[in-house]
Amino acid sequence: MPCLYICGECGAEHEIKPKEPVKCKDCTHRIMYKKRTDKMIQFEAR
């Protein structure tokens, strides 16, 4: 299942699949940030 990541250098969005190197396809920068979900997530407290 691919996830959306945002490049720390140029800000481009890329899908990174499992076993694929974690780097930007535009500028080859290696720091990528995972995009946050728009859905509301609720956790159960115990």
Swiss-Prot record:
It is found in: Nucleus. Zn(2+) binds at C7, C10, C24, C27. Its main location: nucleus. It comes from the Eukaryota. A zinc finger (C4-type) spans 7-27. One of its GO terms (cellular component) is RNA polymerase II, core complex. GO terms for biological process: transcription by RNA polymerase I; transcription by RNA polymerase II; transcription by RNA polymerase III. Component of the RNA polymerase I (Pol I), RNA polymerase II (Pol II) and RNA polymerase III (Pol III) complexes consisting of at least 13, 12 and 17 subunits, respectively. DNA-dependent RNA polymerase catalyzes the transcription of DNA into RNA using the four ribonucleoside triphosphates as substrates. Common component of RNA polymerases I, II and III which synthesize ribosomal RNA precursors, mRNA precursors and many functional non-coding RNAs, and a small RNAs, such as 5S rRNA and tRNAs, respectively. This is DNA-directed RNA polymerases I, II, and III subunit rpabc4. It comes from Dictyostelium discoideum (Social amoeba). The gene is polr2k.
